Amino acid sequence: MTQGKIIKVSGPLVIASGMQEANIQDICRVGKLGLIGEIIEMRRDQASIQVYEETSGLGPGEPVVTTGEPLSVELGPGLISQMFDGIQRPLDRFKLATHNDFLVRGVEVPSLDRDIKWHFDSTIAIGQKVSTGDILGTVKETEVVNHKIMVPYGVSGXVVSIASGDFTIDEVVYEIKKLDGSFYKGTLMQKWPVRKARPVSKRLIPEEPLITGQRVIDAFFPVTKGGAAAVPGPFGAGKTVVQHQVAKFANVDIVIYVGCGERGNEMTDVLNEFPELIDPNTGQSIMQRTVLIANTSNMPVAAREASIYTGITMAEYFRDMGYSVAIMADSTSRWAEALREMSGRLEEMPGDEGYPAYLGSRIAEYYERAGRSQVLGLPEREGTITAIGAVSPPGGDISEPVTQNTLRIVKVFWGLDAPLAQRRHFPAINWLTSYSLYKDSVGTYIDGKEKTDWNSKITRAMNYLQRESSLEEIVRLVGIDSLSDNERLTMEIAKQIREDYLQQNAFDSVDTFTSFAKQEAMLSNILTFADQANHALELGSYFTEIMEGTVAVRDRMARSKYVSEDRLDEIKIISNEITHQIHLILETGGL
């Protein structure tokens, strides 16, 4: 423990002297109030400290005391359904302790509740040899999550005592005699420094798709479990709604939602909506698998920088249990702005647009902690972390540094488009500029598992949209009547794909989520109509005849997005009606 004194205060940056015994990344208690800070730079005996609380009122001469520990999070039962700030202070218990709606400075509240007793079921025998990552037992944390208690990193030996029963998270549950003869007394909780990635046994190639229930994502721009995706877009294009939708309905075991520097109302929406929503995969409330980290725009800037690391460390902990985890960061641009502010106060040489030169490596550091891994310990298991980051480029300009550095690392780009949002087409993901490098592998995976020709259907649908884009210019110049019947049919089919398939209402109880089976049935109907109508044109029918003769069936196709999942047969029989209607047109018209 080192004690120094403040010599300079500049916003969230405090400089203290007499700190020659301190280490970089040590946590400090700053000033008489004991504000939490982290050492980010050392020069001789002077330490630059970024303070995670409001620094107004601090002055030179006040004490600074180091704890000798890095910024760490507590990992154990009690994380799920909780809402923390950027440095893992529980907001509900913080309010109870301070009787204040705002964060009172210098108050210490344990991250995990020390009073709740959790029922621990041991799955291991006394005398058994264990090592890092081995599962010792489970705690039923919620109806959905079985919290697995693992041997902490760096501990191995023989179990000399372990018991099932009810324990608080700081009571000794098991004892291990280590190889050097010393004893390790373990609790249900462990600590881990947030800036250090948790180790794994082996990195694996992600293959299984993350099913989100959002048709434009699952069909055209899929992300795998263990993949990384970016959602850049201008203000009002729907970044937060896309993130909320994925957080609500993704087929993962755990969701960690980091609200980083965005509006407080958006976190309020999450708190109001999530408890009422039922997870289609488990039938339980979505909050029973969710951890929220709220670091809204009016909270201290430095804590924004920590919130991303806090979230990804929690995600790694659940991954080590063998779970699939999705982490949403909304928005990484605000996190980058926090980096820029601290860099400016440190008087570092600025890079592009004032961001620090190390922006790219920091962004890469975050996304590289995602992935599919074989984790340490027995029984052998795999875990995945899928990282989805929103990016808010000023004015929607994706050539700015945060977006460009993000796109260098992630493999999926869901580009939100202001003109689409203005036309009320949501999700406003532009199908011409977005891309997914997982598309082929996901298509092959689905074709093999579901025994379908999903990959070829997606390719055909995308071809229609691309052809529509090239025809639109002709239509704008000389009008739609100048097109041939074949080209007009192409425009009509592309319109059906856009409006009846890609457009989705997040606020409709049925349309908000679409299972893979329903997605395939809807797309198959559109492509069946395309095949039958093209066939009719070849046999001499006119485009207007086909449109007039299929009004009713096309209306049913458009309404199929509002047909509930338990009535899928109603969607599947539409293809027979399409064939029947086209046959009637051929019998009564054409050549």
From Swiss-Prot:
The reaction(s) annotated as catalysed by this protein in its Swiss-Prot or TrEMBL entry are: ATP + H2O + 4 H(+)(in) = ADP + phosphate + 5 H(+)(out)
Residues where ATP binds: 233-240
A Pfam short name: ATP-synt_ab_Xtn
Write out the function statement from the record.
Produces ATP from ADP in the presence of a proton gradient across the membrane. The V-type alpha chain is a catalytic subunit.
EC number per UniProt = 7.1.2.2
- Database matches in PANTHER family: H(+)-TRANSPORTING TWO-SECTOR ATPASE (PTHR43607:SF1), V-TYPE PROTON ATPASE CATALYTIC SUBUNIT A (PTHR43607)
Instruction: Supply the alphabetized keyword list.
Output: ATP synthesis, ATP-binding, Hydrogen ion transport, Ion transport, Nucleotide-binding, Translocase, Transport
What is one GO biological process annotated to this record? proton motive force-driven plasma membrane ATP synthesis
Q: Which Gene3D superfamilies match?
A: 2.40.30.20, 2.40.50.100, Bovine Mitochondrial F1-atpase, Atp Synthase Beta Chain, Chain D, domain 3, P-loop containing nucleotide triphosphate hydrolases
Could you say which protein family the record assigns here? Belongs to the ATPase alpha/beta chains family.
Protein name per UniProt: V-type ATP synthase alpha chain
Q: Which InterPro entries match?
A: ATP-synt_VA_C (IPR055190), ATP-synth_a_Xtn (IPR031686), ATP_synth_asu-like_sf (IPR023366), ATPase_a/bsu_AS (IPR020003), ATPase_F1/V1/A1_a/bsu_N (IPR004100), ATPase_F1/V1/A1_a/bsu_N_sf (IPR036121), ATPase_F1/V1/A1_a/bsu_nucl-bd (IPR000194), ATPase_F1/V1_b/a_C (IPR024034)
Q: What Gene Ontology molecular-function terms does this entry list? A: ATP binding; proton-transporting ATP synthase activity, rotational mechanism; proton-transporting ATPase activity, rotational mechanism
Return the HAMAP family for the record: ATP_synth_A_arch
Q: What class of enzyme is it?
A: translocase
